[in-house]
A protein has these predicted regions:
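Short beta-strand His + acidic residue motifs that chelate non-heme Fe in jelly-roll/DSBH
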Residues: 67-70, 85, 92-100, 168
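Histidine-centered divalent metal-coordination motifs
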Residues: 49-51, 93
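Short acidic-glycine-tyrosine-enriched beta hairpin
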Residues: 71-86
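A short, N-terminal "cap"/entry segment at the start of jelly-roll beta-barrel domains
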Residues: 1-42, 46-47, 75-77, 96-105, ...
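Short beta-strand segments in beta-sandwich/barrel cores
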Residues: 39, 63-67, 82-83, 116, ...
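Short N-terminal edge-element motif at the start of the domain
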Residues: 55-59, 65-68, 73
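Single conserved hydrophobic/aromatic residue that forms the stacking wall/gate
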Residues: 161-165, 169-170
């Protein structure tokens, strides 16, 4: 089972223990600490809040995700983009739905870092496929520079490029 909370402006599903959801059997999986599926109402979001020693990946599925932080980054990302924030020694950031009339749906993933107390870092990446091939996996995050994005952990993230319609009913 997953945790679920409805705060009016935020509907969120938690794969692991998070906020008011606690399941001692679901605190983390290896280095994966958080896998949240969030839906944020238009114009709403998370005010400035701190993180330390965590790799935070945000993946918009629908809508416009506005990010701002204490190391002078400010931008809006959309589906096909990802943002990677290495909190290191500490960073303060906010995330908001930049639309006035459309829901924002995004995944937020937290990964424990390989090395703690590094310099905070933020970057966004366009991970839209550069191929027209269907049903392929695309490497979007890797620790060794072999993907558009990297994090401070031995972790690889793959994205399904495109699922074609089945040619026959199942």
């Amino acid at each position: 089972s997953r945790g679920y909370a409805n705060h009016g402006w935020l509907k969120t599903h938690h794969t692991f223990s998070f906020a008011n959801y606690y399941n001692p059997e679901r605190v983390h999986f290896g280095m994966l600490r958080v896998l949240n599926d969030d839906s944020v109402a238009p114009g709403e979001g998370f005010d400035m809040h701190p993180h330390k020693n965590m790799e935070v990946i945000s993946i918009p599925l629908k809508g416009y995700l506005r990010h701002g932080d204490s190391i002078k980054n400010s931008e809006v990302i959309t589906p096909g983009d990802i943002q990677v924030m290495s909190a290191g020694t500490g960073i303060v950031h906010s995330e908001f739905n930049d639309s006035g009339n459309e829901q924002l749906e995004f995944l937020q993933i937290w990964v424990f870092p390989r090395e703690e107390n590094t310099k905070p870092h933020y970057a966004s990446y366009d991970v839209r496929p550069v191929t027209s091939e269907k049903n392929k996996l695309s490497l979007i995050i890797a620790p060794d520079g072999s993907a558009p994005a990297s994090i401070n952990q031995d972790a690889w993230f793959l994205s399904l490029i495109h699922i074609s319609e089945p040619t026959r009913p199942y």
